[in-house]
Regions:
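Short, high-confidence coil segments that cap the C-terminus of an alpha-helix
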Residues: 38-40, 97-100, 225, 342-344
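A structural signal for short, well-ordered beta-strand segments and their strand-loop junctions
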Residues: 101-106, 187-189, 229, 346-350, ...
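Acyl-donor-binding surface of acyltransferase catalytic domains
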Residues: 84-185, 189, 209-213
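A conserved beta-strand-loop-helix scaffold within acyl/acetyltransferase catalytic domains
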Residues: 4-48, 53-64, 138-148, 162-163, ...
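Glycine-/proline-rich flexible loop or hinge segments
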Residues: 66-78, 102, 111-114
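A short, internal acetyl-CoA/4′-phosphopantetheine-binding micro-motif in the GNAT/acyltransferase core
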Residues: 73-80, 317-325, 353
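Conserved acetyl-CoA-binding loop-helix of GNAT-fold acetyltransferases
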Residues: 81-93, 324-338
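Active-site/acyl-donor-binding loops of N-acyltransferases
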Residues: 5-8, 31-32, 117-163, 346-408
Length: 408
């Protein structure tokens, strides 16, 4: 068996039904990265007309030295150690000729499911693949706690067959209903509106202003990406707030009579809470009235979603922090799940941290995603296959590997 370059048709036919198929291992992703500092190759491990493994391999320079990166790992049967070993041996020979100094992989192999309450891990049958890769010469890198690596090590994935607003956390349900009451609307957007997403996410991650537009242009060629925006419908906001105010006013009048007849602390506190709610609704009506005749649509949140196989993945999302009280991020995620529920099996909410403690600086992000009741999966992590130890150790000692790959 030997390694050779595959043409587009060969690769797509092999990849589309593979167990580890993912959007990072697609021709679309190859084209995207080729516009943002990488070269790429599509390779296969073959014997005559049979392909046993394949990969999109990205190539880049660090300090004048070439390295390769295989996002989400090779498309190969990792449980077949003899196949992995043969492939790896040929891989080293193949890329040594191309002056590649090391190959980084982060396979999309789930090794455990984490209980969001107890944080206890239940390991899968894939866990021994760590030892398989190490025996085949791959160096297992330290597992990250937060978001230090290229891709998140822990992902939150919602099974859409289980998805129902009634199953969500109380806080999440309340935030979604608040967004609905405040007149939030959800729409499919176009690439020409990508400036909104760039604005919503500019403090979250540093990207070229053209990066997400390029993403959309390339992935939309085969309809494997969607762009969504959330705006405020102030007319709906007024109507909803008026209805809520009138309903609460009737409740408040009943509570007022109750306090007069039974002036207990509990009744007084309930009446005071109702007074606060009435004031909030009154302020909502005033705010909506003030903005009712704005000459433009006001977008306050957005997301890009990539589709591959039976999974839709929220690639990036963000919202205007001025509208925090509208809970637009909760409304956005809820509507995305509704949008895909009849077409896809899973929604990948993307990364959360391995450290789920309250003390973690990403606790708010974790709790936001956990409120949608996802399954929490831990992936196998990053491995390096060293081809030129001298150059690899040189880059390591100079801190250039950490600079290139550590995302914190």
């Amino acid at each position: 068996m030997y390694i050779r370059e595959l043409n587009a048709e060969e690769y797509e036919n092999f990849a589309k039904n593979h167990k580890y198929a993912n959007y990072h291992q697609t021709l679309n992703y190859a084209m995207l990265k080729s516009e943002h500092d990488y070269e790429y190759e599509i390779i296969g491990f073959c014997d005559d007309d049979t392909i046993y493994a394949a990969a999109l391999v990205l190539v880049k320079l660090i300090d004048g030295y070439l390295y390769a990166y295989v996002p989400e790992g090779f498309l190969i049967d990792y449980e077949n150690e003899s196949l992995v070993r043969l492939f790896t041996d040929e891989l080293i020979k193949y890329y040594k000729k191309e002056d590649i100094n090391f190959i980084k992989i982060n396979p999309s192999i789930i090794i455990s499911e984490i209980d969001p309450k107890t944080h206890i891990k239940t390991y899968t049958d894939n866990y021994p693949i760590i030892n398989t890769l190490e025996r085949c010469g791959y160096i297992k890198l330290n597992d990250n706690t937060n978001f230090e690596s290229i891709l998140p090590r822990v992902n939150a994935i919602v099974n859409l067959n289980e998805f129902n607003i009634n199953n969500l956390s109380k806080n999440t349900k309340n935030k979604i209903r608040k967004g609905i009451r405040k007149g939030l609307t959800f729409e499919v957007a176009e690439n020409s509106q990508m400036n909104y997403l760039n604005e919503f996410t500019k403090r979250k991650i540093k990207r070229s202003e053209f990066y997400y537009s390029d993403y959309y242009n390339i992935f939309s060629r085969n309809h494997s990406i969607d762009y969504f925006l959330v705006s405020v419908d102030y007319e709906k906001y007024i109507l909803n707030s008026q209805m809520a105010y009138e309903k609460e006013l009737k409740k408040n009048e009943r509570l007022n009579n109750k306090v007069k007849n039974i002036p207990k602390t509990r009744n007084i506190n309930t009446k005071m809470n109702s007074d606060k709610t009435l004031l909030a609704y009154k302020n909502d009506i005033a705010l909506a009235s003030k903005n009712l005749n704005k000459p433009f649509k006001e977008y306050i949140a957005g997301a890009l979603v990539v589709k591959n196989g039976d999974t839709a993945t929220i690639l990036i999302s963000g919202y205007d922090k001025k509208y925090y009280d509208f809970a637009p991020n909760y409304f956005l995620y809820f509507m995305i799940m509704n949008y895909y529920q009849n077409e896809y099996k899973y929604i990948n909410l993307n990364g959360i941290t391995a450290d789920l403690s309250k003390e973690n600086k990403y606790h708010g992000l974790n709790e936001f995603k956990l409120g949608f009741k996802p399954h929490i999966y831990e992936y196998i992590g990053e491995f390096d296959l060293v081809i030129n130890p001298h150059i690899y150790n040189k880059l390591l000692k100079k801190g250039l590997l950490e600079k290139e790959f550590n995302k914190n």
